[in-house]
Structure formats: structure tokens, C-alpha cells
């Protein structure tokens, strides 16, 4: 009889400070183990009391990452999916709100048979059950990241649950990796290990002895400091891993492998493995560091002061850049600042592409509409995502279809032309008579693409599936009028009732596409999403024309309207114009107050 399969557990904790990059460390380790032939899944334990991040302010939490099954999760789940090239489900993100809700609901049903319900054992048992639920025969390793920092009150039940899991599965089947900060003090010119020593001491006081320590720093750690940390924290010398800032987040697996973390883990857990297969990742790194092309793309959004609010968008854009061998310089543009056509022209000067991402609420909407009009009229490749599609429809209704008061019922409930309206099953939510959290149109839905359209060409398929997160949709009462004005409805739900993709014809604009979905959630660094790849390719072509001052065919300002002679397919007369001059690569809007972010992530997510 064969030996029973035993799933191994790796727990990743953090100390000294938040935002050290536990998620990227865990993701990179997962990538290394998968490259060694192991089957890996990942999970994030979040100590906040929200059931999920769906109703959180983007400025507080960053983006909400949506899984195939419609779960609204932490942005680290996006890192897990991108680095491992897998699709996770809602079980990958556990929150204190979920845990307490489940325990209290069970108590109300009489599930505890009159017991006094307590943090230990009932809350910790629920946490353990959610950890162990992932450990089935299809998985060799479960990597579980604990959110927050050791010493936080709200993290204590999770750390106690991990201690118990280690005891129950056996020391040979569980391993704890502690990510800690080793700061550099400029006045003394020294890296200091004392914060890490105290952090490990705090972890040990809870009953958890780390097996490995990943030391985050802004420079490499000398071997003498590694030995000191090993001695003072009671871990093996080879288990102290230096993790200095990297030039790209995609360098982190190489850094951790060079430090020997993955080799130590597989040996410590007794895992069968092969050597790391770097074929795919090395190809990626070559494109990260040695691209052949360049282009500048603006993200016109409401939450640009916190780039994490658009994390998957920027990573999908970088993946599109890698796929086209391009370095993309990002320019962050606050939609509020696009207050007039002249201001917008200044902010978007020298731009080769525009992304209008998702969001909620009326603030900044008029600025997005102005930016979209500028991009449409000047032939700048543009991708609208979720709210971006809705803004494209509103702008087309106003500028092309002559519906000057067109709007969304989200912004102006009594608008005379609601070209964007509340979905039928969302009216009670909008009215406040039904819960807001977890009630949007969430998860994976199919989309049928019209033959011969740009969207169908980019996808290379007649039907695709994308993840969604929205309450509003294109109003079908206006579809015929908008189509007559030149807007192409190139993708719909299989029943044809819900608009999924809009675009302008290729003879009117080189790349002007909007999707109601969130395609960024299905992009991978080694497998770019078609819409982002297409946007970058179009932006590179635009950049080449702009730098060469070559003629660009654009719709004529006095082209006929649908009422006076434009063919039904929306084709318009074009005129030759000269593209604007090149702008600098370090821009935030019109100023240099924020560095641009290259497609390799150099100026943003540079630490594991």
C-alpha cells in the first residue's frame, strides 16, 4: 500500500513594520516551489473585521481583487495568481469578519450544544478549518500569509491557530517564514538587527518559533549579520535570507533562490522536487530589463494618489509591455484635474495611450469624460475598464449622438438620457433596502464577440470569459442610437441583453476599446491579457508616429453626423494631422511631482 499523501504547510508572518512585502515574498516562494515541480496553492489571513474588502475605501485598502467565483478579496490574492499563474477562489482570503460571522451563526443554530463560545477554541478552530480545507490530495504545499504585524492584537487568534496547526500536522510538515525589517541607520552607517531580534522574540512569546527569517533591507546583508541573526533568533545559518530592494518585483524569485530559501524549504519539509526550471521566467526577465520599444501611457483615475488602488491594472499593463517587448512609462493623471479641454491637453501631452480604470461615485467623472474626448479626437489608443466603458458610452452619447445631457443614473438619478442605468437586480441595493456588501454582479461571466471587430481580433476567439464587479450597465434603450452615431457594440452577454465591450471602428480610431469587465484580474506576467497587449502595441505605433512626426489619420472635425450621411457602420471621413511633441517620462499630470513608473516596476513595487 502506498504512503498517504501529506500536504505541507508554510506560514508567512511579518514583523517590525507593515508593507514589508510579505505577499510578494510568499508569492515568489510559491513560484520557486512550482518551478521545482510542486503543486502549490496560497491563502491570505486578514485580521480586519470586515467580511471582505468590497465596501472599503480604495485609499485605505487599495484595490479589491475579484476571483472567478465572485469573491472580493485582498490585493495580495492578485500577486498569488500572477506569480503562480493559477486561478484561486474565495477560500484564498480569510477575514476575521468571515470567521466571527460563521462562529456566531453556528452558535445561533445551536451548533455548539450550549457551550460557552470563546476565542479559544471556537474562533481558532474555525481558522484552522479554513487553513486545512485547502490541504487536499491535489496540493503538495499550502502557503498561508498572515496579514498585519506580529504584536498586533487582532493577529493573535491567527498566530495561535497556526501554532496549533503546526502541532497537529507535525513539525516535519509545517514551516514558518518570518519576514522582518533590517533598517539602515545613515548616521552610524550600519544595518541594525535589534528590531528583527525583538520581532522574533515577540513571535516566540506567542509560541511560534520561526524556521526561516527573510530580512528586508535597502541593501545586501553581509554574512556576519546573517550569522548574528541566526544565533540570536535560533534559526539555522542557511535559513537567514537577505531580501534587499530589487529593481523589479519579478526579480524577487531570483533573489530568494540565490539566497537559498527554496532549497532550504524543500529540504526542511522533505519534499520531492526537481531543479528550478527558469525557462519561462528568464524570458520574462529579459523583457523586463532589456525592452526594445518604449511608450508612455496615462492612467486617468480617481484614486491615483494610492497606486495600489489600481495594482492589477498596472501589473496587467506591464504584462502587456513584456509581451510586446516594450518599456511603458506610466503617467498618473488625477481625473479631477482634467477640468477643461486645455488642461487635459496639457496633462496628456506626449501620451501614447490612455487607460480609464474602474471606480464608483460622481467625483472626477467629468474629468474622465474630457480625457476620453481628447483621446478619441486625437487618435490616442485608449482602454476603458468597467466605469471606463460607461464613461466612453456617456462621452459618445454627448459628443457623437447629440445627447448633451446624457449621464449615468449613478451620478444623476433623474438624467433625461440615462445611457447608463442601474441593473435590474440592483435597485434595492441602490435604494438602501438591501445589503451593499457582496451584492454586485461579481465573478466570471461569458461574453460573445462580434466577428470582424477589434475585440474579436485581439482575443482571437468568438466567446470569452472575464471577471466582473459592477452595479450599472449600458441602457439597451439607447443602443440603436449610439450604434448609429458610430459606437460599435462588439461584445455582449450570450443572451445579447448586456453590453460587455464597445469600440470605435478601425478606420475611425486606431484603438478605442471599453470593457464592462475587469480584464486585469486574468492577466499574468508571462501571459498578457489580449486587451492590454493590444493597447501597448497600439501605443508603441503611436509613439513611433509621434517621434517621427508622421501623419496620423483622424476623424475630421467637420465629418458628417449620422443624421446627415455617415454610413450605418459608423465610418467617418479622416484628415491627416501631425502628432504632438514628445513629453518627458517623469510626469504626474503636468508636473514632475511623482516619478513615472516603468513597465518593470522600478519606481513602484520594488521590494518583496
From Swiss-Prot:
Subunit: Homotetramer.
Similarity comment text for this entry: Belongs to the CTP synthase family.
Note: CTPSs have evolved a hybrid strategy for distinguishing between UTP and CTP. The overlapping regions of the product feedback inhibitory and substrate sites recognize a common feature in both compounds, the triphosphate moiety. To differentiate isosteric substrate and product pyrimidine rings, an additional pocket far from the expected kinase/ligase catalytic site, specifically recognizes the cytosine and ribose portions of the product inhibitor.
Chain positions covered by the region annotation Disordered: 550-608
Catalytic activity line of the entry: UTP + L-glutamine + ATP + H2O = CTP + L-glutamate + ADP + phosphate + 2 H(+); L-glutamine + H2O = L-glutamate + NH4(+); UTP + NH4(+) + ATP = CTP + ADP + phosphate + 2 H(+)
Keywords attached to this entry: ATP-binding, Glutamine amidotransferase, Ligase, Magnesium, Metal-binding, Nucleotide-binding, Pyrimidine biosynthesis
Keyword Nucleotide-binding carried by entry: yes
Pfam families registered for this protein in UniProt: CTP_synth_N (PF06418), GATase (PF00117)
NCBIfam families with a match to the protein in the record: PRK05380.1 (NF003792), PyrG (TIGR00337)
Any one GO molecular-function label of the UniProt entry: metal ion binding
Classification via PROSITE patterns: GATASE_TYPE_1
Chain positions recorded as UTP binding sites: 18, 192-197, 228
Protein activity control: Allosterically activated by GTP, when glutamine is the substrate; GTP has no effect on the reaction when ammonia is the substrate. The allosteric effector GTP functions by stabilizing the protein conformation that binds the tetrahedral intermediate(s) formed during glutamine hydrolysis. Inhibited by the product CTP, via allosteric rather than competitive inhibition.
Functional summary from the UniProt entry: Catalyzes the ATP-dependent amination of UTP to CTP with either L-glutamine or ammonia as the source of nitrogen. Regulates intracellular CTP levels through interactions with the four ribonucleotide triphosphates.
Pathway assigned to this chain's UniProt record: Pyrimidine metabolism; CTP biosynthesis via de novo pathway; CTP from UDP: step 2/2
Feature: compositional bias, Low complexity: 584-594
Name by which UniProt lists this protein: CTP synthase
Binding site for L-glutamine: 359, 387-390, 410, 471
UniProt-annotated stretches for the region Amidoligase domain: 1-271
Domain Glutamine amidotransferase type-1: 296-545
